[in-house]
Amino acid sequence: LFENCSWSPDFSDHRKWCLPGETAARDRLHQFVTRVVDKYDHDRDYPDVEGTSRLSPYLAAGVLSPRQCLAEITALQGNGQLPDFATGAGSWLNELIWRDFYSHVMVAFPRVSKGLPFQLITEKVKRRYDEKQLQAWQQGLTGYPIIDAAMR
Protein backbone atom coordinates (compact mmCIF):
# COMPACT_ATOMS: atom_id res chain seq x y z
CA LEU A 1 0.00 0.00 0.00
CA PHE A 2 2.75 2.47 0.89
CA GLU A 3 5.46 1.40 -1.57
CA ASN A 4 4.61 4.24 -4.00
CA CYS A 5 4.62 6.90 -1.29
CA SER A 6 7.61 9.12 -0.62
CA TRP A 7 7.15 8.65 3.12
CA SER A 8 6.99 5.65 5.35
CA PRO A 9 4.49 5.60 8.20
CA ASP A 10 5.86 4.68 11.59
CA PHE A 11 3.46 2.45 13.45
CA SER A 12 5.99 1.38 16.08
CA ASP A 13 4.17 3.13 18.92
CA HIS A 14 0.61 2.30 17.84
CA ARG A 15 -0.03 0.39 21.05
CA LYS A 16 0.52 3.56 23.07
CA TRP A 17 -2.29 5.35 21.25
CA CYS A 18 -5.06 3.56 23.12
CA LEU A 19 -3.87 1.82 26.23
CA PRO A 20 -6.45 -0.56 27.70
CA GLY A 21 -8.30 -0.06 30.95
CA GLU A 22 -10.18 2.51 32.95
CA THR A 23 -7.05 4.03 34.48
CA ALA A 24 -5.60 4.69 31.03
CA ALA A 25 -8.93 6.14 29.89
CA ARG A 26 -9.13 8.50 32.86
CA ASP A 27 -5.50 9.51 32.36
CA ARG A 28 -6.17 10.27 28.69
CA LEU A 29 -9.26 12.31 29.62
CA HIS A 30 -7.27 14.29 32.18
CA GLN A 31 -4.42 14.92 29.72
CA PHE A 32 -6.88 16.08 27.08
CA VAL A 33 -8.73 18.41 29.44
CA THR A 34 -5.58 19.94 30.92
CA ARG A 35 -3.40 20.16 27.79
CA VAL A 36 -5.48 20.07 24.60
CA VAL A 37 -9.09 21.13 25.13
CA ASP A 38 -8.41 24.89 25.18
CA LYS A 39 -7.45 24.80 21.50
CA TYR A 40 -9.81 21.97 20.51
CA ASP A 41 -12.15 24.17 18.47
CA HIS A 42 -9.24 25.07 16.18
CA ASP A 43 -6.75 22.19 16.40
CA ARG A 44 -9.20 19.31 15.91
CA ASP A 45 -9.15 19.98 12.16
CA TYR A 46 -5.38 19.54 11.80
CA PRO A 47 -4.08 15.96 11.79
CA ASP A 48 -0.48 17.12 12.27
CA VAL A 49 -1.16 18.39 15.81
CA GLU A 50 -2.56 16.61 18.83
CA GLY A 51 -5.88 18.40 18.66
CA THR A 52 -8.46 15.71 19.34
CA SER A 53 -9.42 13.93 22.52
CA ARG A 54 -8.57 10.42 21.29
CA LEU A 55 -11.27 9.22 23.68
CA SER A 56 -13.55 7.60 21.09
CA PRO A 57 -12.44 4.01 21.78
CA TYR A 58 -12.99 4.49 25.50
CA LEU A 59 -16.42 6.06 25.00
CA ALA A 60 -17.47 3.45 22.42
CA ALA A 61 -16.47 0.58 24.70
CA GLY A 62 -18.10 2.13 27.76
CA VAL A 63 -14.80 2.49 29.61
CA LEU A 64 -15.57 6.21 29.94
CA SER A 65 -19.02 7.76 30.08
CA PRO A 66 -20.12 11.16 28.82
CA ARG A 67 -20.98 11.95 32.44
CA GLN A 68 -17.36 11.40 33.48
CA CYS A 69 -16.23 13.68 30.65
CA LEU A 70 -18.70 16.35 31.73
CA ALA A 71 -17.47 16.12 35.33
CA GLU A 72 -13.87 16.59 34.18
CA ILE A 73 -14.79 19.59 32.02
CA THR A 74 -16.82 21.29 34.77
CA ALA A 75 -14.00 20.64 37.24
CA LEU A 76 -11.66 22.40 34.81
CA GLN A 77 -13.96 25.43 34.85
CA GLY A 78 -13.40 25.66 38.58
CA ASN A 79 -16.90 26.92 39.23
CA GLY A 80 -19.01 23.87 38.41
CA GLN A 81 -20.44 25.69 35.40
CA LEU A 82 -20.64 24.51 31.83
CA PRO A 83 -18.06 26.10 29.56
CA ASP A 84 -19.02 28.73 27.03
CA PHE A 85 -19.75 26.87 23.79
CA ALA A 86 -17.53 29.35 21.91
CA THR A 87 -14.45 27.93 23.68
CA GLY A 88 -12.46 24.79 22.95
CA ALA A 89 -13.95 23.04 25.98
CA GLY A 90 -17.45 24.11 25.01
CA SER A 91 -16.95 23.01 21.43
CA TRP A 92 -15.78 19.57 22.55
CA LEU A 93 -18.63 19.24 25.04
CA ASN A 94 -21.12 20.20 22.33
CA GLU A 95 -19.75 17.46 20.05
CA LEU A 96 -19.87 14.96 22.90
CA ILE A 97 -23.52 15.84 23.51
CA TRP A 98 -24.38 15.37 19.82
CA ARG A 99 -22.45 12.07 19.76
CA ASP A 100 -24.49 10.79 22.68
CA PHE A 101 -27.74 12.11 21.23
CA TYR A 102 -27.23 10.40 17.89
CA SER A 103 -26.27 7.10 19.49
CA HIS A 104 -29.67 7.20 21.21
CA VAL A 105 -31.36 8.18 17.94
CA MET A 106 -29.85 5.15 16.22
CA VAL A 107 -31.14 2.85 18.95
CA ALA A 108 -34.64 4.33 19.01
CA PHE A 109 -34.94 4.98 15.26
CA PRO A 110 -32.63 2.57 13.40
CA ARG A 111 -34.47 3.35 10.17
CA VAL A 112 -32.86 6.81 10.18
CA SER A 113 -29.50 5.17 9.40
CA LYS A 114 -31.11 3.71 6.28
CA GLY A 115 -32.23 7.05 4.87
CA LEU A 116 -35.78 6.79 6.19
CA PRO A 117 -37.45 9.62 8.14
CA PHE A 118 -38.06 9.70 11.88
CA GLN A 119 -41.79 9.83 11.30
CA LEU A 120 -42.77 7.23 8.71
CA ILE A 121 -45.92 9.20 7.94
CA THR A 122 -43.68 11.82 6.26
CA GLU A 123 -42.08 9.27 3.97
CA LYS A 124 -44.49 10.04 1.14
CA VAL A 125 -44.11 13.82 1.38
CA LYS A 126 -42.85 15.07 -1.97
CA ARG A 127 -39.67 17.07 -1.61
CA ARG A 128 -38.76 20.02 -3.78
CA TYR A 129 -35.21 20.42 -4.97
CA ASP A 130 -34.91 23.92 -6.37
CA GLU A 131 -31.35 25.25 -6.56
CA LYS A 132 -32.47 28.91 -6.76
CA GLN A 133 -34.63 28.58 -3.65
CA LEU A 134 -31.82 26.82 -1.80
CA GLN A 135 -29.39 29.62 -2.64
CA ALA A 136 -31.93 32.27 -1.62
CA TRP A 137 -32.38 30.53 1.72
CA GLN A 138 -28.61 30.14 2.22
CA GLN A 139 -28.08 33.84 1.49
CA GLY A 140 -31.02 35.03 3.58
CA LEU A 141 -32.95 36.30 0.57
CA THR A 142 -36.19 34.32 0.77
CA GLY A 143 -38.47 37.32 1.20
CA TYR A 144 -39.56 36.12 4.65
CA PRO A 145 -37.98 38.65 7.06
CA ILE A 146 -37.71 36.35 10.08
CA ILE A 147 -36.10 33.58 8.01
CA ASP A 148 -33.78 35.97 6.23
CA ALA A 149 -32.71 37.58 9.51
CA ALA A 150 -31.92 34.17 10.99
CA MET A 151 -29.85 33.16 7.99
CA ARG A 152 -27.78 36.34 8.01
PLM regions: where:
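Flexible, P/S/T/G-rich "lid" or insertion loops adjacent to the active sites of thioester-utilizing
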Residues: E123-Q135, Q139
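Glycine/tryptophan-enriched, flexible segments
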Residues: L1-T122, R128
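Helix-hairpin-helix/helix-loop-helix acidic hairpins
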Residues: Q135-R152
